[in-house]
Every structure is written in C-alpha cells, then in structure tokens.
Amino acid sequence: MRDLKTYLSVAPVLSTLWFGSLAGLLIEINRFFPDALTFPFFLIRVIVAGRGEKD
C-alpha cells in the first residue's frame, strides 16, 4: 500500500513537470517561428538534401 501511495504522489508531479516543460518549449518555438506550419530548419535540410550535389 505504501508503494501505491508513493506512485500516486510521484506520478502527478512528474507529469506536471513534463507537460509544463513541453508547453514551455512549444511556446518558445512559437515565439521564434510564429504561425509556422513548417519550421525553417527542417525545410533547409530538405532543400540541401534535394540539391543532389555529387562529388
């Protein structure tokens, strides 16, 4: 029973920290790239990879 009490007290704290940090990360990404459907750093990799430069 003590293990169940420990689990029930730790899981909400960990999930709150996890979702809080995830929300903060998404807020910061949205601050630097507002209203972005695609993010430029992914697009740059696709453009560079699609050039087909050969040695």
Curated annotation (Swiss-Prot):
Belongs to the PsaJ family. Its main location: plastid. GO terms for biological process: photosynthesis. It is found in: Plastid, Chloroplast thylakoid membrane. This is Photosystem I reaction center subunit IX. Keywords: Chloroplast, Membrane, Photosynthesis, Photosystem I, Plastid, Thylakoid, Transmembrane, Transmembrane helix. The keyword Cytoplasm does not apply. The chain crosses the membrane at residues 7-27. GO terms for cellular component: chloroplast thylakoid membrane; photosystem I. SUPFAM superfamilies: Subunit IX of photosystem I reaction centre, PsaJ (SSF81544). May help in the organization of the PsaE and PsaF subunits. It is a single-pass membrane protein. It holds the Pfam family PSI_PsaJ.
